[in-house]
A protein has these predicted regions:
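Tandem repeat scaffolds
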Residues: 25, 68, 95-98, 111-411
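N-terminal capping/linker segments that flank leucine-rich repeat
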Residues: 3-8, 12-133, 372-415
Length: 415
């Protein structure tokens, strides 16, 4: 084994170790300032681990890096962290910056406790479809603007404080990625794969995300606004405390998704599937759910205002302890639905199927049970004015106008 790749003997003094290290690796991997962050007794172990990493880099053909090699390098950094004073691997980061001059080149900077360990420009391999392969990288503080990243692969990536702005990300793969405080601003994400991602405090603003797979994704506290989600799949997605604002999402699949404690305003869910969705303690305002499925959906403790659910399947839906204002359920199926301890203001049940419903209405402090067979015929019961609730009257002519206005308001700000 040549001198450049040899290990320092344990019999050498600390002075000899430092000398040999400086001689063979100065300005290449790590300096004494970085080493000083580790315990003195651990210098030999640190140098040995870094030398292993250096040999891996030296073995790369033309500077290219593979998934397997990247995993090995990352593991060595984790091993190094275990010997650090803090024994924390979260202080180790790989920061990646896309080069505007050379589209396929990025600068990778390794940090240990905020000290630069290794600088290198490597070529990101292209995928078979022409995109770039960023898979399994740890990308912190990355900012990519106005780039074509279509067909790229970010599978298994860890993205922290990342920004993608004005990018074409058609058919991009984020499968199993971990995202913390990520922003997609004015990006094309159509036909992309976000299945099983873990996103915290992420934002999609003014994006086109049609036909996107969000299957089993964890997106708590996500902020999605002015975005198109047509035909996208959120099956069993966890989206607690999500904020959806001015979103076009016809035919979207939210089957068994969890949107508890969420806020939804100005949404077009026409022909959508929200069956078995958990909307406990959510706020729904100005929602178009015409001809949609809400079978066995949980709307407990929920506030609904100006929600249009005409011609929808809402059998077995649970409205217990909910507040409903200016909502339309005419011509919908509400068989065996539950509305116990519910407050209703200007709610339209014309021609709805309400057989087997369990209903008790809160009026002031009084809880009044109602026979479901007479619910529709007692429409005037829900026509009272309330100073804290305003809305359109219950005429059939106004229902389509309300739905069209909701969609028009969304489109006005989504262009």
């Amino acid at each position: 084994m040549n001198d450049n790749h040899s290990f320092t003997s344990s019999s050498h003094t600390k002075k000899t170790k430092s000398y040999n290290y400086s001689k063979h690796h100065k300005n290449t991997l790590i300096d004494n300032k970085a080493l000083s962050l580790f315990k003195m007794d651990d210098h030999e172990k640190v140098i040995g681990l870094i030398q292993k990493m250096k040999r891996i880099y030296d073995s790369l053909p033309s500077g290219k890096i593979t998934k397997e090699t990247d995993r090995k390098i990352h593991k060595h950094f984790i091993d190094i962290a275990l010997y650090a004073n803090n024994k924390c691997d979260d202080r180790i980061t790989r920061r990646v910056y896309l080069s505007k001059e050379k589209e396929v080149s990025i600068k990778v900077v390794y940090f240990i406790n905020n000290v630069a360990v290794h600088n290198n420009t490597i070529e990101i391999p292209q995928t078979v479809n022409g995109g770039y392969d960023f898979s399994h990288l740890s990308l912190k503080g990355i900012v990519i603007k106005d780039e074509d990243l279509s067909n790229s692969n970010f599978a298994g990536c860890r993205l922290q404080n990342a920004i993608f702005q004005d990018c074409n990300m058609y058919k991009t793969n984020f499968y199993y990625a971990i995202m913390e405080k990520i922003l997609f601003d004015n990006c094309i994400l159509d036909d992309s794969n976000f299945a099983q991602i873990k996103m915290a405090d992420g934002t999609l603003n003014a994006c086109s995300a049609m036909h996107v797979q969000f299957y089993n994704a964890a997106m708590n506290r996500a902020n999605i606004k002015n975005t198109f989600l047509d035909y996208s799949n959120f099956y069993i997605a966890y989206m607690a405390e999500v904020n959806l604002y001015k979103v076009i999402a016809p035919y979207v699949n939210l089957f068994k998704a969890d949107l508890s404690f969420s806020k939804l305003d100005l949404i077009n869910f026409e022909h959508a599937d929200l069956s078995r969705v958990n909307l406990n303690k959510a706020i729904l305002q100005n929602i178009n759910l015409i001809d949609s499925k809400l079978f066995c959906t949980w709307l407990t403790n929920t506030f609904l205002e100006m929600v249009i659910c005409t011609d929808s399947n809402m059998a077995n839906v649970n409205f217990n302890n909910a507040n409903l204002s200016n909502c339309h359920f005419n011509c919908s199926i509400l068989t065996k639905a539950c509305m116990f301890n519910t407050r209703l203001y200007r709610v339209n049940f014309d021609e709805a199927s309400v057989q087997g419903m369990g209903i008790s209405i809160l009026r002031g402090e009084e809880n009044i049970p109602i026979d479901s067979d007479t619910l529709v015929t007692r429409q005037k019961f829900f026509e009272e004015d309330c100073t804290s609730h305003t809305g359109m009257s219950q005429t059939e002519d106004n229902i389509n106008a309300v739905a069209m206005k909701i969609t028009a308001d969304i489109m006005q700000h989504a262009d």
